[in-house]
């Protein structure tokens, strides 16, 4: 069972702890170039532990929206190397090393192969030459303490699992980009997340019917990447409408475009859906800056 609750009442900051229950807070629910929402980065909180999944170009602003900052968040998990998901990590690295005066580095949960890719192809250019560490350029480990998920198997898929306090985080690869990829093996690194084997968040992905259908068997609530147009590297609303009723009925849609609330702009007369996800059998559009609380 879950409830949707208001956060930051009377200007209060979002607490990074709970009384033991699982909480998911989307700092944003928008697509990469959104102007009406923040980007789809989200906090997972349980007990005394938390993790921010992705920190895009608008991530530091989105944290400020809820009274937080990149120095207050102490654990991060990047899913893939697109700017709306990792564009804020340079600020995370630099603020925590040079501005906040914290004695501790923030933590990063990251799979081994992706760690090298994230650093060499995205983050190193902005931060590795800030100083000489024993005569060598800085490395990711100079900015973050690395927490390593372990490879295992779930539902016949290779996944990576990390126990973060009382929350279990299971990462699975997704079929996101390039758009020519027809299998996970041909795709660049991108991951979705299963939390406590209860809450599944697709991560960025093209439409991959088996992916949500398979995880719906063990998930209470699901959040699926959704765009309002066809093509590209995200699942479209039209494609998601082909999922079984029992999958849609437990799925919220997120990572959507700025015209989500104007279905006349993207629903065709020939479509057999309304563009209102509740009427169309989903749980609805996911909302930013509210708490999805799980008992």
Segments predicted by a language model, with ranges:
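Cap/insert and terminal regions of metallo-dependent hydrolase folds
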Residues: 205-295
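Phosphate- and divalent-cation-binding pockets in alpha/beta enzyme and binding domains
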Residues: 61-62, 85-88, 117-118, 210, ...
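Active-site neighborhood of phospho(di)ester-bond hydrolases with catalytic His/Asp-centered motifs
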Residues: 52-56, 73-84, 88, 110-111, ...
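Structured loop/turn residues at beta-strand edges in well-structured enzyme cores
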Residues: 19, 68-71, 104, 165-167, ...
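Short active-site oxyanion
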Residues: 48-51, 103-107, 198-199, 249-250
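Core dinuclear metal-dependent hydrolase active-site scaffold
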Residues: 2-68, 145-210, 287-295
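Acidic/polar short surface loop at catalytic or gating sites that assists cofactor/ion binding
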Residues: 99-152
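Active-site metal-binding motif and surrounding structural segment of the metallo-beta-lactamase
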Residues: 57-109, 218-221
């Amino acid at each position: 069972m879950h409830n949707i609750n208001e956060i930051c009442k009377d200007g209060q900051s979002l607490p990074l702890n709970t009384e033991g229950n699982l909480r998911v807070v989307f700092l944003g629910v928008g697509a990469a170039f959104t102007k009406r929402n923040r980007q789809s980065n989200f906090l997972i909180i349980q007990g005394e532990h938390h993790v921010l999944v992705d920190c895009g170009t608008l991530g530091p602003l989105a944290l400020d929206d809820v009274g937080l900052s990149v120095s207050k968040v102490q654990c991060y998990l990047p899913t893939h190397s697109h700017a709306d998901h990792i564009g804020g990590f340079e600020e995370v690295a630099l603020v925590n090393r040079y501005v906040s005066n914290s004695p501790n580095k923030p933590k990063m949960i990251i799979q081994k192969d992706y760690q090298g890719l994230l650093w060499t192809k995205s983050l190193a250019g902005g931060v590795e030459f800030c100083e000489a560490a024993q005569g060598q350029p800085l490395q990711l480990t100079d900015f973050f303490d690395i927490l390593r998920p372990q490879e295992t198997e779930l539902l016949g898929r290779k996944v990576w699992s990390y126990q973060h306090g009382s929350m279990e985080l299971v990462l699975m690869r997704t079929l996101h980009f390039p758009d020519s990829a027809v299998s996970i093996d041909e795709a660049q690194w991108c991951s979705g997340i299963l939390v406590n084997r209860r809450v599944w968040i697709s991560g960025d992905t093209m439409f991959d019917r088996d992916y949500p259908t398979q995880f719906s068997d063990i998930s209470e609530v699901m959040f699926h990447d959704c765009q309002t147009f066809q093509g590209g590297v995200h699942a479209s609303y039209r494609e998601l409408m082909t999922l079984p009723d029992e999958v849609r009925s437990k799925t919220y849609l997120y990572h959507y475009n700025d015209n989500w609330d104007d279905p006349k702009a993207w629903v065709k007369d020939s479509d057999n859906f309304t563009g209102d996800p509740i009427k169309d059998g989903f749980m609805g559009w996911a909302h930013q800056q509210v708490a999805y609380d799980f008992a």
